[in-house]
């Protein structure tokens, strides 16, 4: 795991050097999560992740890429660095 952290840090540095970095970060374990539901009159706060899943989000990147091919190439490099799957999505309203 220590090597994955080092490789991810190196990947982050490369994103910054190449001008793709916008924001990113690792997340605390899902067991430390709080779920907030403010839809009703009283806000309800519960412990734990909202979703039951074998795969949990350990972190994320927000990058800037000129096209989908570049984003996919960067995602593949990020996946290799962090030793996990990377999901690619554009922000709503972007091409």
Which positions does each model-derived feature cover?
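Conserved, structured core segments of small domains
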Residues: 1-95
């Amino acid at each position: 795991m220590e090597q994955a952290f080092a490789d991810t840090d190196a990947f982050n540095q490369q994103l910054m050097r190449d001008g793709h970095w916008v924001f990113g970060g690792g997340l605390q374990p899902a067991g430390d999560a709080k779920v907030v539901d403010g839809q009703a009159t009283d806000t309800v706060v519960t412990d734990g992740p909202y979703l039951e899943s074998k795969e949990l989000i350990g972190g994320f990147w927000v990058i800037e890429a000129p096209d989908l091919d570049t984003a996919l190439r960067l995602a593949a490099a990020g996946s290799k660095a962090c030793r996990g799957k990377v999901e690619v999505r554009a922000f709503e309203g972007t091409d």
